[in-house]
Protein backbone atom coordinates (compact mmCIF):
# COMPACT_ATOMS: atom_id res chain seq x y z
CA UNK A 1 0.00 0.00 0.00
CA UNK A 2 1.01 3.67 -0.24
CA UNK A 3 1.67 3.88 3.53
CA UNK A 4 4.29 1.10 3.18
CA UNK A 5 6.04 2.75 0.24
CA UNK A 6 9.74 3.43 0.73
CA UNK A 7 11.21 6.15 -1.46
CA UNK A 8 14.09 5.35 -3.78
CA UNK A 9 15.79 8.52 -2.62
CA UNK A 10 15.32 10.19 -6.00
CA UNK A 11 11.96 11.92 -6.41
CA UNK A 12 11.60 11.44 -10.14
CA UNK A 13 12.30 7.69 -9.78
CA UNK A 14 9.58 7.13 -7.18
CA UNK A 15 6.67 6.85 -9.66
CA UNK A 16 8.52 4.07 -11.48
CA UNK A 17 9.32 2.39 -8.17
CA UNK A 18 5.61 2.37 -7.34
CA UNK A 19 4.89 0.51 -10.58
CA UNK A 20 7.68 -1.99 -9.89
CA UNK A 21 6.51 -2.55 -6.32
CA UNK A 22 2.95 -3.17 -7.49
CA UNK A 23 4.14 -5.74 -10.03
CA UNK A 24 6.07 -7.58 -7.31
CA UNK A 25 3.11 -7.41 -4.92
CA UNK A 26 0.57 -8.57 -7.51
CA UNK A 27 2.70 -11.32 -9.06
CA UNK A 28 3.30 -12.92 -5.66
CA UNK A 29 -0.39 -13.01 -4.74
CA UNK A 30 -3.48 -12.74 -6.94
CA UNK A 31 -1.42 -12.29 -10.10
CA UNK A 32 0.28 -15.66 -9.68
CA UNK A 33 -3.07 -17.44 -9.30
CA UNK A 34 -4.38 -15.74 -12.45
CA UNK A 35 -1.28 -16.82 -14.40
CA UNK A 36 -1.70 -20.44 -13.23
CA UNK A 37 -5.36 -20.40 -14.29
CA UNK A 38 -4.41 -18.93 -17.66
CA UNK A 39 -1.84 -21.70 -18.09
CA UNK A 40 -4.34 -24.43 -17.27
CA UNK A 41 -6.89 -22.99 -19.69
CA UNK A 42 -4.21 -22.87 -22.38
CA UNK A 43 -3.32 -26.52 -21.85
CA UNK A 44 -6.98 -27.55 -21.93
CA UNK A 45 -7.31 -25.87 -25.32
CA UNK A 46 -4.13 -27.58 -26.53
CA UNK A 47 -5.33 -31.11 -25.72
CA UNK A 48 -8.84 -30.39 -27.02
CA UNK A 49 -10.57 -30.79 -23.66
CA UNK A 50 -12.39 -27.46 -23.96
CA UNK A 51 -13.77 -28.58 -27.32
CA UNK A 52 -15.06 -31.82 -25.79
CA UNK A 53 -16.76 -29.96 -22.93
CA UNK A 54 -18.44 -27.50 -25.29
CA UNK A 55 -19.60 -30.39 -27.49
CA UNK A 56 -21.03 -32.37 -24.56
CA UNK A 57 -22.87 -29.37 -23.11
CA UNK A 58 -24.08 -27.80 -26.36
CA UNK A 59 -25.31 -30.87 -28.26
CA UNK A 60 -28.57 -31.38 -26.27
CA UNK A 61 -29.72 -27.83 -27.12
CA UNK A 62 -30.16 -28.84 -30.78
CA UNK A 63 -33.06 -31.10 -29.73
CA UNK A 64 -35.09 -28.28 -28.11
CA UNK A 65 -37.41 -26.68 -30.67
CA UNK A 66 -39.11 -23.94 -28.60
CA UNK A 67 -37.15 -20.71 -29.17
CA UNK A 68 -38.17 -19.02 -25.93
CA UNK A 69 -37.42 -22.07 -23.79
CA UNK A 70 -33.97 -21.93 -25.35
CA UNK A 71 -33.41 -18.35 -24.16
CA UNK A 72 -32.90 -19.02 -20.41
CA UNK A 73 -31.28 -22.40 -21.12
CA UNK A 74 -28.70 -20.82 -23.43
CA UNK A 75 -28.04 -18.02 -20.96
CA UNK A 76 -27.38 -20.45 -18.09
CA UNK A 77 -25.36 -22.77 -20.33
CA UNK A 78 -23.21 -19.85 -21.48
CA UNK A 79 -22.49 -18.92 -17.88
CA UNK A 80 -21.63 -22.55 -17.12
CA UNK A 81 -19.25 -22.62 -20.08
CA UNK A 82 -17.53 -19.51 -18.68
CA UNK A 83 -16.01 -21.89 -16.11
CA UNK A 84 -14.22 -23.60 -18.99
CA UNK A 85 -13.62 -20.54 -21.18
CA UNK A 86 -12.90 -17.59 -18.85
CA UNK A 87 -12.39 -15.10 -21.68
CA UNK A 88 -15.74 -13.42 -22.39
CA UNK A 89 -14.71 -12.56 -25.96
CA UNK A 90 -13.54 -16.12 -26.73
CA UNK A 91 -16.71 -17.55 -25.21
CA UNK A 92 -18.87 -15.24 -27.33
CA UNK A 93 -17.00 -16.30 -30.48
CA UNK A 94 -17.46 -19.99 -29.66
CA UNK A 95 -21.16 -19.55 -28.88
CA UNK A 96 -21.69 -17.59 -32.09
CA UNK A 97 -20.00 -20.36 -34.07
CA UNK A 98 -21.80 -23.26 -32.38
CA UNK A 99 -25.04 -22.23 -30.66
CA UNK A 100 -26.09 -19.21 -32.72
CA UNK A 101 -27.01 -21.27 -35.83
CA UNK A 102 -28.84 -23.77 -33.60
CA UNK A 103 -30.85 -20.97 -31.97
CA UNK A 104 -31.72 -19.44 -35.35
CA UNK A 105 -32.68 -22.83 -36.76
CA UNK A 106 -35.00 -23.34 -33.78
CA UNK A 107 -36.81 -20.13 -34.76
CA UNK A 108 -35.24 -17.59 -32.39
CA UNK A 109 -35.03 -14.06 -33.75
CA UNK A 110 -31.64 -12.65 -34.68
CA UNK A 111 -31.63 -10.02 -31.92
CA UNK A 112 -32.78 -12.45 -29.23
CA UNK A 113 -30.05 -14.94 -30.15
CA UNK A 114 -27.42 -12.20 -30.13
CA UNK A 115 -28.70 -10.75 -26.84
CA UNK A 116 -28.63 -14.02 -24.93
CA UNK A 117 -25.11 -14.80 -26.16
CA UNK A 118 -23.83 -11.30 -25.39
CA UNK A 119 -24.98 -11.48 -21.76
CA UNK A 120 -23.27 -14.77 -20.90
CA UNK A 121 -20.12 -14.81 -18.75
CA UNK A 122 -21.59 -12.33 -16.29
CA UNK A 123 -21.31 -13.17 -12.58
CA UNK A 124 -20.61 -16.90 -12.50
CA UNK A 125 -19.55 -17.88 -8.96
CA UNK A 126 -16.22 -19.57 -9.56
CA UNK A 127 -12.94 -19.43 -7.61
CA UNK A 128 -11.21 -19.78 -10.98
CA UNK A 129 -12.34 -16.32 -12.13
CA UNK A 130 -9.61 -13.68 -12.13
CA UNK A 131 -12.03 -11.07 -10.77
CA UNK A 132 -12.99 -13.27 -7.81
CA UNK A 133 -9.34 -14.11 -7.15
CA UNK A 134 -8.42 -10.42 -7.10
CA UNK A 135 -11.33 -9.44 -4.83
CA UNK A 136 -10.61 -12.29 -2.40
CA UNK A 137 -6.96 -11.24 -2.24
CA UNK A 138 -7.92 -7.65 -1.41
CA UNK A 139 -10.47 -8.72 1.23
CA UNK A 140 -7.88 -11.00 2.83
CA UNK A 141 -5.80 -7.92 3.60
CA UNK A 142 -8.51 -6.57 5.92
CA UNK A 143 -8.90 -7.55 9.57
CA UNK A 144 -12.50 -8.73 9.08
CA UNK A 145 -11.63 -11.16 6.26
CA UNK A 146 -8.05 -12.02 7.18
CA UNK A 147 -6.94 -15.26 5.54
CA UNK A 148 -9.92 -15.37 3.17
CA UNK A 149 -9.31 -17.66 0.19
CA UNK A 150 -10.91 -17.43 -3.24
CA UNK A 151 -12.90 -20.62 -2.51
CA UNK A 152 -14.23 -19.26 0.79
CA UNK A 153 -15.16 -15.95 -0.83
CA UNK A 154 -17.05 -17.61 -3.68
CA UNK A 155 -18.78 -20.45 -1.83
CA UNK A 156 -19.62 -18.54 1.36
CA UNK A 157 -20.47 -15.08 0.04
CA UNK A 158 -20.50 -14.70 -3.75
CA UNK A 159 -22.76 -17.69 -4.45
CA UNK A 160 -25.48 -16.37 -2.12
CA UNK A 161 -25.93 -13.37 -4.40
CA UNK A 162 -24.85 -14.61 -7.83
CA UNK A 163 -26.95 -17.80 -8.14
CA UNK A 164 -30.30 -16.09 -7.40
CA UNK A 165 -29.24 -13.19 -9.65
CA UNK A 166 -28.42 -15.53 -12.54
CA UNK A 167 -31.79 -17.28 -12.19
CA UNK A 168 -33.63 -13.95 -12.14
CA UNK A 169 -31.65 -12.79 -15.18
CA UNK A 170 -32.52 -16.01 -17.04
CA UNK A 171 -36.21 -15.55 -16.24
CA UNK A 172 -36.07 -11.87 -17.21
CA UNK A 173 -34.44 -12.84 -20.51
CA UNK A 174 -37.36 -15.16 -21.28
CA UNK A 175 -40.04 -12.49 -20.83
CA UNK A 176 -38.00 -9.56 -22.16
CA UNK A 177 -36.95 -11.25 -25.43
CA UNK A 178 -40.52 -12.47 -25.95
CA UNK A 179 -41.86 -8.95 -25.37
CA UNK A 180 -39.28 -7.30 -27.63
CA UNK A 181 -39.82 -9.80 -30.44
CA UNK A 182 -43.55 -9.24 -30.28
CA UNK A 183 -43.14 -5.47 -30.29
CA UNK A 184 -40.64 -5.55 -33.16
CA UNK A 185 -42.75 -8.03 -35.09
CA UNK A 186 -39.79 -10.38 -35.59
CA UNK A 187 -40.40 -13.25 -37.95
CA UNK A 188 -39.62 -16.23 -35.75
CA UNK A 189 -40.16 -18.67 -38.60
CA UNK A 190 -37.20 -17.28 -40.47
CA UNK A 191 -34.74 -20.13 -40.19
CA UNK A 192 -32.71 -19.46 -43.32
CA UNK A 193 -29.46 -20.11 -41.52
CA UNK A 194 -27.21 -23.04 -42.28
CA UNK A 195 -27.05 -25.16 -39.16
CA UNK A 196 -23.40 -25.29 -38.19
CA UNK A 197 -23.19 -28.43 -36.16
CA UNK A 198 -21.03 -28.42 -33.06
CA UNK A 199 -17.83 -30.11 -34.14
CA UNK A 200 -18.11 -33.84 -33.58
CA UNK A 201 -15.64 -35.18 -31.06
CA UNK A 202 -14.20 -38.53 -32.00
CA UNK A 203 -13.25 -41.08 -29.37
CA UNK A 204 -14.70 -43.52 -26.89
CA UNK A 205 -17.32 -42.65 -24.29
CA UNK A 206 -14.62 -42.87 -21.61
CA UNK A 207 -12.45 -40.38 -23.50
CA UNK A 208 -15.33 -37.92 -23.94
CA UNK A 209 -16.31 -38.23 -20.28
CA UNK A 210 -12.79 -37.76 -18.90
CA UNK A 211 -11.87 -34.91 -21.24
CA UNK A 212 -15.19 -33.15 -20.66
CA UNK A 213 -14.44 -33.19 -16.92
CA UNK A 214 -10.80 -32.06 -17.14
CA UNK A 215 -11.51 -28.32 -17.73
CA UNK A 216 -13.84 -28.37 -14.71
CA UNK A 217 -11.55 -30.51 -12.54
CA UNK A 218 -10.04 -27.67 -10.44
CA UNK A 219 -13.46 -26.33 -9.43
CA UNK A 220 -14.73 -29.89 -8.79
CA UNK A 221 -11.79 -30.44 -6.44
CA UNK A 222 -12.42 -27.14 -4.66
CA UNK A 223 -16.13 -27.94 -4.27
CA UNK A 224 -15.40 -31.40 -2.84
CA UNK A 225 -12.84 -30.06 -0.37
CA UNK A 226 -15.17 -27.21 0.64
CA UNK A 227 -18.00 -29.70 1.25
CA UNK A 228 -15.74 -31.99 3.31
CA UNK A 229 -14.34 -29.20 5.46
CA UNK A 230 -17.79 -27.66 6.00
CA UNK A 231 -19.49 -30.93 7.03
CA UNK A 232 -16.74 -32.78 8.89
CA UNK A 233 -14.59 -29.95 10.20
CA UNK A 234 -11.50 -31.58 8.67
CA UNK A 235 -8.63 -29.21 7.92
CA UNK A 236 -7.72 -29.45 4.24
CA UNK A 237 -5.96 -26.47 2.70
CA UNK A 238 -6.52 -26.72 -1.05
CA UNK A 239 -5.86 -23.39 -2.75
CA UNK A 240 -6.90 -22.48 -6.28
CA UNK A 241 -3.35 -22.67 -7.57
CA UNK A 242 -2.76 -26.07 -5.92
CA UNK A 243 -5.98 -27.46 -7.42
CA UNK A 244 -4.99 -26.13 -10.86
CA UNK A 245 -1.46 -27.57 -10.72
CA UNK A 246 -2.78 -30.95 -9.50
CA UNK A 247 -5.35 -30.94 -12.31
CA UNK A 248 -2.57 -30.07 -14.77
CA UNK A 249 -0.58 -33.13 -13.67
CA UNK A 250 -3.69 -35.34 -13.98
CA UNK A 251 -4.31 -33.93 -17.48
CA UNK A 252 -0.73 -34.77 -18.51
CA UNK A 253 -1.20 -38.35 -17.27
CA UNK A 254 -4.46 -38.60 -19.25
CA UNK A 255 -2.68 -37.37 -22.37
CA UNK A 256 0.15 -39.87 -21.86
CA UNK A 257 -2.37 -42.71 -21.59
CA UNK A 258 -4.32 -41.51 -24.64
CA UNK A 259 -1.43 -40.78 -27.00
CA UNK A 260 1.20 -43.21 -25.65
CA UNK A 261 3.77 -40.67 -26.87
CA UNK A 262 5.74 -39.37 -23.90
CA UNK A 263 8.01 -36.96 -25.77
CA UNK A 264 5.16 -35.26 -27.68
CA UNK A 265 2.95 -35.09 -24.60
CA UNK A 266 5.64 -33.46 -22.47
CA UNK A 267 6.49 -31.07 -25.32
CA UNK A 268 2.82 -30.07 -25.38
CA UNK A 269 3.04 -28.84 -21.78
CA UNK A 270 4.69 -25.74 -23.24
CA UNK A 271 1.15 -24.55 -23.97
CA UNK A 272 0.63 -24.22 -20.20
CA UNK A 273 3.35 -21.57 -20.00
CA UNK A 274 2.12 -19.88 -23.16
CA UNK A 275 -1.28 -19.72 -21.49
CA UNK A 276 0.35 -18.07 -18.49
CA UNK A 277 1.80 -15.48 -20.84
CA UNK A 278 -1.64 -14.95 -22.36
CA UNK A 279 -3.02 -14.14 -18.90
CA UNK A 280 -0.40 -11.46 -18.28
CA UNK A 281 -2.61 -8.61 -19.63
CA UNK A 282 -5.09 -9.36 -16.82
CA UNK A 283 -2.28 -9.03 -14.27
CA UNK A 284 -1.19 -5.79 -15.95
CA UNK A 285 -4.72 -4.42 -15.51
CA UNK A 286 -4.59 -5.23 -11.79
CA UNK A 287 -1.23 -3.48 -11.51
CA UNK A 288 -2.55 -0.44 -13.40
CA UNK A 289 -5.55 -0.25 -11.08
CA UNK A 290 -3.31 -0.56 -8.02
CA UNK A 291 -1.00 2.19 -9.27
CA UNK A 292 -4.03 4.41 -9.90
CA UNK A 293 -5.25 3.84 -6.34
CA UNK A 294 -1.79 4.60 -4.96
CA UNK A 295 -1.83 7.86 -6.91
CA UNK A 296 -5.22 8.81 -5.47
CA UNK A 297 -3.99 8.01 -1.96
CA UNK A 298 -0.83 10.05 -2.46
CA UNK A 299 -2.83 13.20 -3.16
CA UNK A 300 -5.18 12.49 -0.26
CA UNK A 301 -8.30 11.99 -2.39
CA UNK A 302 -9.19 8.59 -0.89
CA UNK A 303 -8.93 9.96 2.64
CA UNK A 304 -11.12 12.93 1.75
CA UNK A 305 -13.76 10.63 0.22
CA UNK A 306 -13.72 8.42 3.31
CA UNK A 307 -14.12 11.43 5.57
CA UNK A 308 -16.96 12.74 3.42
CA UNK A 309 -18.79 9.40 3.52
CA UNK A 310 -18.29 9.15 7.28
CA UNK A 311 -19.72 12.63 7.69
CA UNK A 312 -22.74 11.77 5.54
CA UNK A 313 -23.54 8.59 7.51
CA UNK A 314 -23.07 10.45 10.77
CA UNK A 315 -25.48 13.22 9.80
CA UNK A 316 -27.97 10.60 8.51
Language model feature labels by segment:
Residues 1-2, 156-271:
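Long, contiguous bundles of hydrophobic transmembrane helices that form the permeation core
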Residues 133-137, 177, 226, 289, ...:
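Juxtamembrane/transmembrane-helix interface segments of polytopic membrane transporters
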Amino acid sequence: SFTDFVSSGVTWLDPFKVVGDQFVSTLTSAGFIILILGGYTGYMSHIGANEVTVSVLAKPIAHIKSPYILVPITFLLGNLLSLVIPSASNLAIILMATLYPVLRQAGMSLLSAAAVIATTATIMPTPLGSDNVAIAAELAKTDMFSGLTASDYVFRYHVLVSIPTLLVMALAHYFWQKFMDKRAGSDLTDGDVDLAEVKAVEGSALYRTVYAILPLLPIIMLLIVFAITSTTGAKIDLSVELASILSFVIAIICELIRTRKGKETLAGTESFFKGMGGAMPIVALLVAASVFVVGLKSIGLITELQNAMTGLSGSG
